[in-house]
């Protein structure tokens, strides 16, 4: 049933906005709209508004039994001056005292101002005619309801009185009201003046059974208005004058073997009262003696715990079970087929069940019962077969439900044009053949999408004779009631998973772009802030802190800049050879390093330091930059130290010549005072020297170019360090240490050497080696 949600008669437009949002979100995530609609039905706590000229309204779960504890509301809105007419097609609401449990309300106002027009029971109410342009409809089922009532189905039409003409499928009353054609001569006054029932050419052959109250049935005599209890139906006694209460009664025996090519049977409690204190188990064996398929049709009225099992072949075998039917299939026809003309029907009912069993008919497929018409276009053959397998009875003619695959039982109906089919429920609406089984409802009750034998292109045929979109097949969600749209599917990722992954990747990509943008923005702000406070002094300071570290002691020895001392002894020529190899490898590495460095690499290093090593010095501080100048060379405990700064005053030379010492053997001289020379233990002689080392080459090797094998030329020959030389620039080899001096033993002060410094083309600093 097509439903439209709204907040009220005046608030309908406002209610469509949330519906549109829900539908768009559902379409984006699942690729469909249908799953969002049921949540907005009339029984979900929201009002359902109808503004169509004609329509059909059903109780919840129709044609199944309505559930207990349900509240539904509908609102029919017409134009100004319209008159609304409501006619009931079916009505079965559980009866109670003064309709206090389950009820249906109709009127022009909402509760509590609702007029007391409350309905319940099984008798079809008379037509409801509203002189106003709107009608409220409320349905309520109590939580204690048994759930065994089917509900209701009603049709409505709105329009003005005094109309000169009506549509082709409508009937015009004497007061000018237009009604659907099927409403004429139905023994219900919908015109209000009786004109729709006064000009009937022939009275109905039997009054509608709904004129009798619930739990009764009418006699079929033309003039009879007698209603009898259902217990007196098919009880072996004629209670109606014409014997109609015993006509066409099925076999009520509890189980039997049936051998005809067609027949009928029913459960023993079909027309009986409430079941006794014992359970009921019955089995029927059907053998048509025909190799062709047998067709079984059932009408169920089962209780909550009752069920019917149908098996293929003779005998109850689990591997041949066709279907198990329960109370959920009540009030709708059920058709099953079995191969080779054999089947078994088993009925199981609980004690004191409120159900009334079932009624069944069977026939060989391709044959029609005497009171049925064939679905095939050809006439019946000599053997009773038809061109198309299938049959329909006269009550099934033009009822809106396709009983034939070709739709022959719905063709040529008086309420529709020749090329159209009627909707179910006698609403007078019709639809074209192209609208049949395309998964788009054209009838308010969706009759054009029910019992589909074939589907339109682009749709998939479910095992329950429903059609869905082809794109819904194998999408990971069961859209057919039996799940046949997900059978035989390859292992594929569901569409919703793909959609979720796509959305997740888009969100992650967006977050990544935002993060990168923030990072570049922060870098830009930091660069601008750094440049705003950048001065010439800060740039010089940055250049100063990037100076390379001096070489280590091992590198100096390997380069031949200093001789090995006691803590790095050389005992043999093999060790000297290894040391020479280390020197050669270090020279090659330094040449390779000097050839690779260039301006581009220096600029890259500066950029890297600016990005990740921002100077930490306080802003405005001027770095003290002095030229690197070696004023003294200290040869102490195996370390080469360069003490920058001005050359201090020379110490007082040692006048003690009684025990001459070599330079560096005694304590250094003081600051002008000659300390007493006492007995002291001389340091161990430098015995572990390079075998090729000579004292006269000491000063010459101090100015060796690390990149060349030959010593660098000097301008002036080195002068020996004599303690007796009074010249302040002369090196002193005194072994006496001045107590006010912080210099270690063996200090040789000398003027700045004239040897050329080691320079690299790409470095800003120069390595001065003495």
UniProtKB/Swiss-Prot annotation:
Q: Which residues cross the membrane?
A: 497-517
Query: The LDL-receptor class A domain covers which part of the protein?
Result: 165-201, 211-250, 415-453, 454-490
CDD domains hit by this protein: CUB, LDLa
- Any idea which UniProt keywords this protein has? Coated pit, Disulfide bond, Endocytosis, Glycoprotein, Membrane, Receptor, Repeat, Signal, Transmembrane, Transmembrane helix
Job description of the protein: Probable receptor, which may be involved in the internalization of lipophilic molecules and/or signal transduction. Its precise role is however unclear, since it does not bind to very low density lipoprotein (VLDL) or to LRPAP1 in vitro.
What family is this?
A: Belongs to the LDLR family.
Name of the protein in its database record: Low-density lipoprotein receptor-related protein 3
Which species does this protein come from? Rattus norvegicus (Rat)
Recite the lineage of the species.
Eukaryota, Metazoa, Chordata, Craniata, Vertebrata
**Encoded by which gene?**
Lrp3
């Amino acid at each position: 049933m097509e439903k439209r949600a709204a907040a009220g008669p005046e608030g309908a437009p406002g209610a469509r906005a949330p519906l549109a949002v829900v539908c768009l979100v559902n379409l984006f995530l699942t690729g469909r709209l249908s799953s969002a609609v049921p949540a907005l039905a009339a029984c979900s706590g929201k009002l359902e508004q109808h503004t169509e000229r004609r329509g059909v309204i059903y109780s919840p779960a129709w044609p199944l039994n309505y559930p207990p504890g349900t509240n539904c509301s509908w609102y029919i809105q017409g134009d100004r001056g319209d008159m609304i007419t409501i006619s009931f097609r079916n009505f079965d609401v559980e009866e109670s005292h003064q309709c206090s449990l389950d009820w249906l309300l109709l009127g022009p106002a909402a509760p509590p101002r609702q007029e007391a027009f409350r309905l319940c029971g099984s008798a079809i109410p008379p037509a409801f005619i509203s002189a106003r342009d709107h009608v409220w409809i409320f349905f309520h089922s109590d939580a204690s309801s048994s759930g065994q009532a089917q509900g209701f189905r009603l049709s409505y039409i709105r329009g003005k009185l005094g109309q000169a003409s009506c549509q082709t499928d409508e009937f015009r009353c004497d007061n000018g009201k237009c009604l659907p054609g099927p409403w004429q001569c139905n023994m219900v006054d919908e015109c209000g003046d009786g004109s729709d029932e006064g000009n009937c050419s022939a009275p109905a052959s039997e009054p509608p059974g709904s004129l009798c109250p619930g739990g009764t049935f009418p006699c079929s005599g033309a003039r009879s208005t007698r209603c009898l209890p259902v217990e007196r139906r098919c009880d072996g006694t004629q209670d109606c004058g014409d014997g109609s209460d015993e006509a066409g009664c099925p076999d009520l025996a509890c189980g039997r073997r049936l051998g005809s090519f067609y027949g009928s049977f029913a459960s023993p409690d079909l027309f009986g009262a409430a079941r006794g204190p014992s359970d009921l188990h019955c089995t029927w064996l059907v053998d048509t003696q025909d190799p062709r398929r047998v067709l079984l049709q059932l009408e169920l009225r089962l209780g909550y715990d009752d069920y019917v099992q149908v098996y293929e072949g003779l005998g109850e075998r689990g591997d041949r079970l066709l279907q198990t039917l329960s109370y959920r299939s009540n009030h709708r026809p059920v058709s099953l087929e079995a191969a080779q003309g054999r089947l078994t029907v088993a009925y199981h009912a609980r004690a004191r069940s409120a159900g009334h069993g079932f009624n069944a008919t069977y026939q060989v497929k391709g044959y029609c019962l005497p009171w049925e018409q064939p679905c095939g276009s050809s006439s019946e053959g000599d053997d009773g077969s038809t061109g198309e397998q299938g049959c329909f009875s006269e009550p099934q003619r033009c009822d809106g439900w396709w009983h034939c695959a070709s739709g022959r039982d719905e063709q040529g109906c008086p309420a529709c044009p020749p090329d159209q089919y009627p909707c179910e429920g006698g609403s007078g609406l019709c639809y074209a053949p192209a609208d049949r089984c395309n998964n788009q409802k054209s009838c308010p009750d969706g009759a054009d999408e029910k019992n589909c034998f074939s589907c339109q292109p682009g749709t998939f045929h479910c095992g329950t004779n429903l059609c869905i979109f082809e794109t819904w097949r194998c999408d990971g969600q069961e859209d057919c009631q039996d799940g046949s749209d997900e059978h035989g599917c390859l292992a594929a990722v569901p569409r919703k998973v793909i959609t979720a992954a796509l959305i997740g990747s888009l969100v992650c990509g967006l977050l990544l772009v935002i993060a990168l943008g923030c990072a570049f923005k922060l870098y830009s702000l930091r660069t601008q802030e750094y440049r705003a406070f950048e001065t010439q002094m800060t740039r010089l300071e940055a250049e100063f802190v990037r100076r390379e570290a001096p070489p280590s002691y091992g590198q100096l020895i390997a380069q031949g800049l200093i001789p090995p001392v006691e803590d790095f002894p050389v005992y043999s020529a093999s060790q000297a050879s290894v040391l020479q190899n280390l020197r050669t490898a270090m020279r090659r590495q330094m040449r390779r390093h000097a050839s690779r460095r260039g301006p581009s690499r220096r600029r890259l290093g500066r950029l890297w330091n600016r990005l990740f090593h921002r100077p930490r010095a306080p802003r405005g501080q001027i770095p003290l930059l002095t030229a690197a100048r070696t004023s003294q060379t200290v040869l102490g405990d195996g370390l080469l130290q360069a003490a920058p700064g001005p050359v201090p005053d020379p110490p007082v030379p040692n006048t003690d010549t009684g025990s001459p010492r070599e330079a560096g053997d005694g304590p250094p001289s003081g600051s002008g005072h000659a300390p007493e020379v006492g007995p002291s233990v001389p340091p161990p002689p430098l015995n572990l020297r390079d075998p090729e080392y000579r004292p006269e080459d000491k000063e010459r090797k101090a100015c060796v170019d690390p990149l060349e094998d030959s010593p660098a030329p000097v301008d002036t020959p080195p002068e020996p360090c004599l303690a007796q030389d009074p010249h302040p620039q002369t090196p002193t080899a005194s072994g006496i240490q001045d107590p006010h001096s912080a210099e270690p033993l063996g200090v040789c002060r000398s003027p700045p050497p004239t040897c050329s410094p080691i320079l690299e083309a790409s470095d800003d600093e120069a390595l001065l080696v003495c």
